[in-house]
Amino acid sequence: MLDFCASQPLTLGVELELMIVNRHDYNLTRGSDDLLRLIGREDHGFDIKPEITQGMIEIGTAIHTRTRAMLEELDAIRAVLVRAADTLNLGLAGGGAHPFQHWSEQRIYPKERYLLVSELYGYLAQQFTVYGQHIHIGCPDGDQAIRLAHFLARYIPHFIALSAASPYYQGVDTLFQSSRLTSVNAFPLSGTLPCVTDWAGFNDYFVRMQQLGIVASMKDFYWDVRPKPEYGTVEIRVCDTPLDLLTPVLLAAYAQMLARECMESGWQAIHSDNYLAYSYNRFQACRFGFEGLILNPADNGQVSLQQDLVTTLTRLEPQAAALGCEAERQQLLARALARDNPSRQLRTLYERSGSLNDLVRRQSAVWMRDAATL
């Protein structure tokens, strides 16, 4: 039985998974232990922890009501990380996947849960050396969380296109805007929330999955959007880790605007038909980004992802005004109109330099030093 811990509606938090690279050829390096040990000597009070393999580290923000404060906290967390990384001659970088690392060289971080995941999923755990941003949105109760999770599913392609930052993987151009999510797809408990309509229905589903021995906790679900009952949030999990500090905040603002629209609007029926085109739309966003096509099963309509995002952002103007994030809405709108995302920036840079090593060096400079945008 899962209890949903109520939280203040529309509060925000984000988690970012970061690459740890050496400063010789900018390949991944097993630096998380040394980095965490050195950071642990500071009384910083931030949420900084290991991830599933040793070339990764995760940071998380506190709870925020406004994105400006979130950006300030992310900047302070970065300062702690950069001091330690400089001391150890390590680099840190954003992006959804390291462009040329080889999964077989990655080592599982020696934490009980990660070792269990590795034992269960074998090489999939090593291949899970990919980097994402998770966005948490506060909900007052479990019923609202289920409703919001289903509501947000409609807009998942937007988050993918805006954040896409993994065009290169294992040394090749994947032709995808976001290749990271293909690594998630391999897990049997990935995908979408079941079509339950309230918290009681979700509890019944969860208990049954526990009884069957399929899951032990909510962490075993790798869904694109999932309730996080212990936090009192709904969590969006499809975004690649951005290259800079501003983009995570813009994505969080978009989630907050959508969540406010959902909570302010009347109840909308939840039907399995809403998910008929989900996988197709998700693929379009991963493969083509803003140039993808979005299908709407309700009217059999088809529209470009870019136009759908622009229409949605325009509609959200009242929500942005109420939340004090009109500047963020305008920046998102400008990016959508320009079809500008990290994958496009990464490809442009690689076309100029022809070096994936140099690409990661530039990614690290952007994240660690606020270097000029790629």
UniProtKB/Swiss-Prot annotation:
Domain of life: Bacteria
InterPro entries on file: GCL_type2/YbdK_subfam (IPR050141), GCS2 (IPR006336), Gln_synth/guanido_kin_cat_dom (IPR014746), YbdK (IPR011793)
Pfam families listed in its UniProt record: GCS2
Keyword set, alphabetical order: ATP-binding, Ligase, Nucleotide-binding
Statement: the UniProt record of this protein carries the keyword Nucleotide-binding: yes
Gene3D superfamilies referenced in this protein's UniProt entry, alphabetically: 3.30.590.20
Transcription is among the record's keywords: no
Molecular functions (GO terms): ATP binding; glutamate-cysteine ligase activity
Cross-referenced NCBIfam families: gshA_cyan_rel, PRK13516.1
Function: ATP-dependent carboxylate-amine ligase which exhibits weak glutamate--cysteine ligase activity.
Similarity annotation: Belongs to the glutamate--cysteine ligase type 2 family. YbdK subfamily.
Protein name: Putative glutamate--cysteine ligase 2
